[in-house]
Structures are given as structure tokens and as C-alpha cells.
A protein has these predicted regions:
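Surface-exposed amphipathic alpha-helical tracts and adjacent flexible/coil segments at the periphery
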Residues: 1-181
Length: 181
């Protein structure tokens, strides 16, 4: 937030995110040698603490914040319902906990966090510092694996896999080394 504010005078905490995390940067050392070129060095993966909700409750946490800045309604709806479902399962078997609110949430879909926009997930410094907190190759959502390219022919390709594709779906290709193409 300080970085954003210093560059643009805009505060992401006040709804004015300039999305510097979406831009490519190069990293140059003190001797002027380029270490990294054109990577998304500020593109953090999404923090996902779903696996640790019970530990958070046991530690006294009583409210959660999801990433909602510049996210669309489907993201907020899906991720909120996903956490709600996990919390309700814990509350159902842990009578020492109770809801802080009187209302209840309803939804007509099965919430799946991985189906919402994300750059991959990370527990981000949960118990230790991990090396997988960033998504250097792209600031975009990678979606879910749908299959493997089996044949390239001119401007077309054949995919072998189990996932159904629909009109409007975007595709990202990775080569054998895992590089995005």
C-alpha cells in the first residue's frame, strides 16, 4: 500500500488500487546487473486459510477478511460461501463456538474457491516462510487444468482431457518445462 501510494498518491485501502501488482518489472542488483527481466515481481498468490480455520478459531480469531479489492460479485459470492460452508461445518461439531450473527447465508451452488479468479493459493507465512507466495509469470488467473495438448495442426489443436470447454472460456498453455505460452 505504501508503494502504491508513493507512486500514484492513490490508496488501495481506500478503494483506489492502481494495480501495480499486474505490471512486469525487472530486478537489477547494486552493480547494475539485471537479475530478472519482465516478470510480475509484485504478483502475490491469493492467501487461502481455509485449511487453518479451526486453528484460527482456537487462537481467538472472530472475523475474517477476504480479498475483495477490484473483484467481481461472483468472486465475493463464491469465496464468502466457501468460507461460510467451512465455518458452519466447524460450528456444527464444536459447541463451544457460536455464530456472532443471527442471520444465515443461502446459496444455490457448490462453492469452490479454486473456481474463482486466483493466481494460485498460498498459506503465506502461516507457520514458516515459504517460497511459493508469488506468481511471477502472470498476474492473471490461471484457472484449472483442462487437459493436455495432443496435436497441433495449423491454427488448431486437439486437447485430451476430462474437462468440458464452453464458449468464452480462456485457455493458457504450458510447455513441458512448465513455462506459460
Amino acid at each position: 500500500t505504501l508503494f502504491r501510494s508513493a507512486l500514484s498518491g492513490r490508496s488501495a485501502n481506500r478503494g483506489e488500487c492502481a494495480q501495480y501488482c499486474r505490471l512486469p518489472y525487472s530486478l537489477i542488483d547494486a552493480d547494475g546487473k539485471e537479475i530478472v527481466s519482465g516478470k510480475h515481481l509484485l504478483s502475490l498468490k491469493d492467501m487461502n486459510r481455509g485449511e487453518y480455520l479451526e486453528e484460527l478459531l482456537d487462537a481467538g480469531v472472530s472475523s475474517l477478511k477476504i480479498e475483495g479489492r477490484l473483484k467481481d460479485v461472483s468472486y465475493v459470492k463464491n469465496v464468502t460461501a466457501w468460507y461460510r460452508k467451512k465455518l458452519d461445518a466447524i460450528l456444527a461439531r464444536r459447541p463451544e463456538y457460536r455464530r456472532a450473527s443471527a442471520g444465515h447465508s443461502t446459496y444455490t451452488f457448490e462453492p469452490v474457491a479454486e473456481k474463482s479468479f486466483n493466481r494460485g493459493f498460498t498459506p503465506f507465512l502461516w507457520k514458516e516462510r515459504t517460497k511459493d507466495i508469488t506468481s511471477f509469470d502472470t498476474p492473471k488467473s490461471l484457472g484449472e487444468p483442462v487437459g493436455t495438448v495432443k496435436e497441433l495442426k495449423g491454427n488448431s489443436f486437439t486437447i485430451a482431457g476430462l474437462k468440458q470447454l464452453n464458449n468464452g472460456d480462456g485457455l493458457t498453455f504450458f510447455n513441458e518445462k512448465g513455462d506459460r505460452k
